[in-house]
Amino acid sequence: KESSAMKFQRQHMDSSGSPSTNANYCNEMMKGRNMTQGYCKPVNTFVHEPLADVQAVCFQKNVPCKNGQSNCYQSNSNMHITDCRLTSNSKYPNCSYRTSRENKGIIVACEGNPYVPVHFDASV
């Protein structure tokens, strides 16, 4: 079974891809990373930074998570990210996403030993 840490990497890490200007980026990535199986995941963020930099966020500023849990952390610096949002007229299995590039801080939830990101909470 896929661990929470591995799931985070599959759903949110794209270190090799520089933030692309390709409008199809989200459509390709959401499908390629298995986030359109059974239903279209409505929103997803990819981070274009080295994995070590994203893992380091677990030791930065502790902030409350959206769900009220206390294991979320905000990055000290902005990161290159791509937000993927399902378009309103999109119908499964033809999931269609809007791609928007951002340079923002990220908030991730961390757990485990080693203490690593397991959930992408928000960008700020």
Swiss-Prot record:
Signal peptide: none annotated. Endonuclease that catalyzes the cleavage of RNA on the 3' side of pyrimidine nucleotides. Acts on single-stranded and double-stranded RNA. InterPro entries: RNaseA, RNaseA-like_dom_sf, RNaseA_AS, RNaseA_domain. GO terms for biological process: defense response to Gram-positive bacterium. Glycans are attached at residue 34. The gene is RNASE1. Keywords: Disulfide bond, Endonuclease, Glycoprotein, Hydrolase, Lyase, Nuclease, Secreted. It comes from Chinchilla chinchilla (Short-tailed chinchilla). This is Ribonuclease pancreatic. PANTHER family: RIBONUCLEASE, RIBONUCLEASE PANCREATIC. The lineage of its organism: Eukaryota, Metazoa, Chordata, Craniata, Vertebrata.
